[in-house]
Swiss-Prot record:
It comes from Actinobacillus pleuropneumoniae serotype 3 (strain JL03). Belongs to the NqrB/RnfD family. Its EC number is 7.-.-.-. Part of a membrane-bound complex that couples electron transfer with translocation of ions across the membrane. It is a multi-pass membrane protein. GO terms for biological process: electron transport chain; transmembrane transport. This is Ion-translocating oxidoreductase complex subunit D. Pfam families: NQR2_RnfD_RnfE. The gene is rnfD. It is an enzyme of class 7 (translocase). The chain crosses the membrane at residues 15-35, 36-56, 67-87, 88-108, 125-145, 212-232, 241-261, 265-285, 298-318, 320-340.
Amino acid sequence: MFKMVSSPHTHSSNLTAKFMLWVMVAMLPALGMQAYFFGYGVFIQVFIALLLAVAIEIAIAKLRRKLTAFYVADLSGVLTALILAISIPPYAPYWIIVIGIIVALLLAKHSYGGLGQNLFNPAMVAYALLLVSFPVQMTGWLVPIDLLNEPPTFGDAISLVFSGVTSDGFSVHQLLGSVDGIAQATPLDSAKTSMQKLGVEGVLQSPIFSGLFANGWWQINLAFLAGGLLLIYKRIIHWQIPAAMLGMFALLSGLTDLLLPHTHLNVVSQLFSGAMMFGAFFIATDPVTASITPRGKLIFGGLIGLFVYLIRYYGNYPDAVAFSVLLANICVPLIDHYTQPRLYGTGR
């Protein structure tokens, strides 16, 4: 006699915790690269974010009278915290990451019912709210430390995060102002503010763009690319979303270069600046808020690439990945509705 059980009859070994853990492992090279170029502040932000995220998950479990392991062991809150911590400036005030984690987990995740119920990517909801509400703190990126006359020590990093100044009394913006030829701290910020004055060639010759790999930003994006390819190889994420996102952006950016030369950064510089690779492989591929159908994934990724192009080239925000992901999240129910695979034996 065979015991009759309901489907599913086969089970995937990709449990939620395993999925989250692999994503975090794939982020470690980029995290290390970011810390190498921007200093100890990266680790301080990550520590605060992870500590608060675990505390919130435990508190929510107790409020809902669930087992603590039910909320903590799936690592979803930890991954959200890590993504947000990497996204914000390393020397942003501590209360920035505190507000961000509270918004991400309480407002954008648990207010919808918890893991699997949220409509929008929690980390990007928090990032977008922080960017709109605290633009000065959220644009306080230091240049790579090899461009600074006196890179912050570990003590300076702690002081900057918790008091806003180094032990010598310098703020982040004062440290940034000590580097000649840099208007803003990231390549995209610098290009956005300096393009009309200096032109493309002048921008590319500035300190933040000089050198083979643009002083750290290329290496960070290459590390995210390598981690993303690992996730595709391990079948943790699908290739359609990052391929469609990067392909759409590269296509539109390339056409702009052909039709309007010398008006924007070239395609390669755009692809390897800001959060492009991070967004393509680690943010847009969130299994809860992304499209679930094969064709839908391509459309979803293409939409993100389109939105990033429009905002970067014609909007006020130089990076645009967070806003683009959130805009595409809105379209997911419609995309999934019209891209459902046809059942065998049924009409179109």
